[in-house]
């Protein structure tokens, strides 16, 4: 009897331990699934909340009558940029005049008007139907209204081509806008040789045109002054004979209205691959491996010649 009671007690305690372990395991599994469900519901709530915020911004933007509205949040996939004003010289960070900015027309983008589409270079996202965009008059580059407005708060040039932005009226009535920069410069220089009294007016006309360099030239400087090969061109040109200052490449040009900034121009030759191949051809005869191969080729050619003679 004693042995049976002991065996029954051990079995009862064993079953009781297994039952406790099962309850603990069940409670752990239920707790884990409850936590996962709570996180999933929290994620869905957050997505719904931000979706309502985006819809609110879109509604305010559509109802706004201001074409230059800078409300952020029209497209959830758009990158948001804030161009903060730095504490540098205001002459170097002068933004575009508000009158010129307002004179640039605002258009509504349509995919049918642009077969290849249109990408905003400021936020790096494509324009979709219904987006408001500004098309710059001189270079015909288009950008989002809010993006280009923030850009022009600290810049006065196009983000893509760096050409100076002017009003639509100036672009329409400008006589020399369609000429390339080098042709305009050469024609104006020859005119100044025949009529020196128009030197100062020609300098002012030439300085308003944006400088254009080839794609293989790197230029450093500010947007008001660029110096290359001794020739200095500024927006605020000093008084004097332009032809004389152009011919004298060694003389330093100075201006009382604009600071002189040194420009570093690095010319990258286009025929770099050809020069590299020529250099390799010149270095190959100097290598010992090439010399051995040439000697072996000569020996084989001699043996072949002897066999043919026999």
UniProtKB/Swiss-Prot annotation:
One of its GO terms (cellular component) is membrane. Pfam families: zf-RING_2. It is found in: Membrane. CDD domains: RING-H2_EL5-like. The keyword Nucleotide-binding does not apply. The keyword Hydrolase does not apply. Residues 179-201 have a biased composition (Polar residues). Pathway: Protein modification; protein ubiquitination. GO terms for molecular function: transferase activity; zinc ion binding. Disulfide bonds: none annotated. Gene3D superfamilies: Zinc/RING finger domain, C3HC4 (zinc finger). It is a single-pass membrane protein. InterPro entries: ATL1/ATL16-like, Znf_RING, Znf_RING/FYVE/PHD. The RING-type zinc finger domain mediates binding to an E2 ubiquitin-conjugating enzyme. This is RING-H2 finger protein ATL60. It comes from Arabidopsis thaliana (Mouse-ear cress). The lineage of its organism: Eukaryota, Viridiplantae, Streptophyta, Embryophyta, Tracheophyta.
């Amino acid at each position: 009897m004693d042995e049976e009671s002991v065996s029954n007690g051990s079995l009862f305690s064993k079953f009781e331990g297994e039952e406790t372990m099962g309850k603990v395991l069940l409670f752990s599994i239920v707790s884990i699934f409850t936590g996962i469900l709570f996180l999933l519901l929290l994620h869905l709530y957050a997505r719904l909340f931000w979706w309502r915020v985006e819809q609110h911004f879109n509604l305010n933007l559509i109802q706004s009558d201001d074409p230059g509205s800078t409300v952020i949040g029209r497209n959830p996939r758009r990158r948001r940029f804030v161009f903060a004003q730095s504490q540098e010289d205001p002459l170097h960070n002068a933004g575009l005049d508000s009158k010129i900015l307002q004179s640039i027309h605002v258009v509504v983008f349509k995919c049918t008007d642009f077969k290849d589409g249109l990408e905003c270079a400021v936020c790096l996202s494509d324009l979709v139907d219904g987006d408001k965009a500004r098309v710059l008059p001189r270079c015909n580059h288009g950008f989002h209204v809010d993006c280009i407005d923030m850009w022009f708060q600290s810049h006065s040039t196009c983000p893509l081509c760096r050409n100076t932005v002017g009003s639509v009226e100036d672009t329409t009535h400008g006589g020399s806008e369609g000429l390339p920069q080098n042709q305009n410069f050469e024609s104006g220089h020859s005119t100044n040789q025949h009529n020196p009294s128009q030197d100062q007016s020609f300098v002012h006309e030439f300085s308003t045109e944006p400088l254009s360099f080839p794609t293989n030239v790197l230029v450093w400087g500010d947007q008001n002054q660029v110096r290359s090969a001794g020739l200095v061109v500024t927006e605020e040109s000093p008084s004097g004979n332009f032809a004389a200052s152009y011919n004298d490449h060694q003389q330093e040009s100075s201006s009382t209205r604009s600071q002189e900034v040194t420009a570093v121009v690095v010319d990258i030759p286009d025929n770099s691959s050809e020069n590299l191949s020529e250099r390799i051809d010149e270095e190959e005869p100097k290598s010992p491996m090439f010399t051995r191969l040439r000697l072996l080729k000569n020996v084989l050619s001699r043996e072949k010649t002897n066999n043919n003679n026999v």
